[in-house]
Structures are given as C-alpha cells and as structure tokens.
C-alpha cells in the first residue's frame, strides 16, 4: 500500500515537508511512500515545474540538501518504505541535458519540434542514449539501497517520428528499434535491481503491454481515477491482465463519496494519492480503516484469488465482481452503483456449493449498520450461486464490500 505525494505537493517540497508526509503515511498504515516528480534538477533548471529539469537527474540540492539516502532513511525510521519517480526516456528543452545534446531527441529534420507536457522524447536507437538512460537508473538506485520502489513514468507519446542517428533508409525502423532498446533497458533494470518493486506508468494505459510485464509488478491503467470511470476501466483491464497488476488509488477526482473511491480502489493494488494533511480527521480515519482492512483481509484475495464478473457496468446500474480464494474458503464481493436503479439480486460465482459461508459487510464507517439482509448470516455456496444475494443499493455512488468465509 503506497502513498504518493503528488497531490499534496506537486514539485513544491523540502525535507521537512516530506517528513510530515511520512508521518501521515505511517499514521494511516501505508507501507511505502512514493516521492513523485520534482526531486531533481539544479540551478536555472531546477524542477520547480514541468517545464524545467527533466533529463538532469542529480537530486535537487535546494529541496534535498542531504540527498536521497538521507530522506529514504527518514521514511524508514517511521517504518515506511521509500520509492521514487523516474522518467528516463524524456527531456525538457529547459535542461542541461538538452543544451548539451539537442540532437538526442526524436524529431524530423527541418521541422520545429512539437512538445508534449513541455518535453521531448530521447532517441533510444542511439547507443549513447541507451547508456545515458541506464546511468540514470543505476546512479539513482545503486548508491541508495533503501529505495525499494520505482514509478517509471511516460508522459507523452511519439510525434514527428525521426532519428538523426538512423540512416535515411532506416527511418521506418525507429518504432521497432526504440521498443527493443526500451525492453533491453527494462530487462537490465529488473535484473540489476531484483529487490526493487516497480510500476510502469502512462496516462490512458499507454504503457500496458505483455512485453513489459516481465519487468514490472504493476501498471497504471489510467490517469482517470474518478471511481465511475475506473469501474469500467478496471472491468475491461482485468480481461487481459491480473488484478495484482492494476494500480488502483484513492484520489479526489470525480463527484463521489470517499467510501466509493475507497471501495473501487480496494479491488486492485490499493494506493493513496491524497493530501492527507488537508483531509478531515474523519477522512483520515476512513483511509486508515481501509488500509488495515486491505492488508489484513482483502489483499490476499485480490492478489491471488480468482476473478468472477457478476454484474456488468455496461448492462446494469450496478457493477459487481468478486475474488474467490483458490481453496474456495474465502471471497470478497464488490457492489458499485454507477447510476440510480436497482439490481435486485446478485448471483455469486466460484464458490464450493457444499460449503457454508458467513456473509459480512466490511468497509463500513463507524456506527453505520449494514443494509444487506444477508449480513451476519450463513448460506451454502449453492444458495449464493443459485439464489444470490439480495442487493439493497439503488442510488448512484453507493457501494459495498462483502467478505465471505466458509465455516469449517
């Protein structure tokens, strides 16, 4: 369970601010703190916004005067792991790297380069760029063994495909040669740092593919973290990739109850992208309860269970899915109201017809009583699969999480 600082700070932070955030991460039970964009760049190219410094991967002496090793150890003092953001394939024109090597970017000759998020893409067909990008990774991680997580980002796509390195007759090779070089870099990263967990990130699932999957532990499915959007995104995503690769984070995006944002995120690799110091005490308590619930009861089912699609969000105002443990002893069931309306009963799947299961609604705020008639009761697997669970939800943004445990 990770906490990302981006929503809290963007590029504006220092060591004291990060320590405050570490304290917040510890208080809600997060296991890892991810230091996002903004930790690098110096002088006129300090990474104080997204227009400067990309490509200059020396830690900011202004923000982190004691270096990465110090700030990682400060997280560990609080029993919180430490991860870091990298975007090794990119460069800002406002950077020392670009001033030295303007020919390293992908562009077409005699055309003004087009920027995306104020940045260009480095040409990985060039051997010197391949060496440079490995050096970024190596010099960030090898001297700092306390960094145990990497978010590898990619914030723009290729336009004006052209290489000043490739011969004119080979320009059409750029797409393939780039990707092979990228896979080699990813392979070297995974083998060089086998104890570092990594998420591959790009908006809109732009970096989700089976070729990269051997080198990463999870993917970022979309920058759309509105729960209503994520329900359909994760429904589709999980047709092709397992749930343990779906990074699902609680954010402020969308009109929704915090409970719904939490319940949707609980169906994937759970994380938090919130400014906890700006949250109310009630919201922080809600997050802490969700983290505890996920770590203790839900995570094993999501990470290793079998997925059953119960009600499609494309066919009903309700979306429902479940994960069932391989031994059929436990299951977690999710209910999400994407619109007003009622799906009267939900038939479960994957249970042992002969086992008896106790139903318990979890992810409830303190003092709130379950509305599910089945809550606290025991049913056979056959009953739950043939007759189903009565569903009391009928209003948009309502959600519920139920856990089933077989009575031995």
Show which residues each predicted segment covers:
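Carbohydrate-binding surface patches
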Residues: 313-354
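Catalytic cores of secreted or luminal carbohydrate-active enzymes
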Residues: 262-311
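C-terminal beta-sandwich/jelly-roll accessory domains of carbohydrate-active enzymes
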Residues: 339-408
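Active/binding-pocket-proximal capping segment
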Residues: 38-40, 101, 155-158, 167, ...
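Glycan-recognition surfaces
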Residues: 92, 98-131, 135, 176-278
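Aromatic-lined carbohydrate-binding/catalytic grooves of carbohydrate-active enzymes
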Residues: 2-135, 144, 148-149
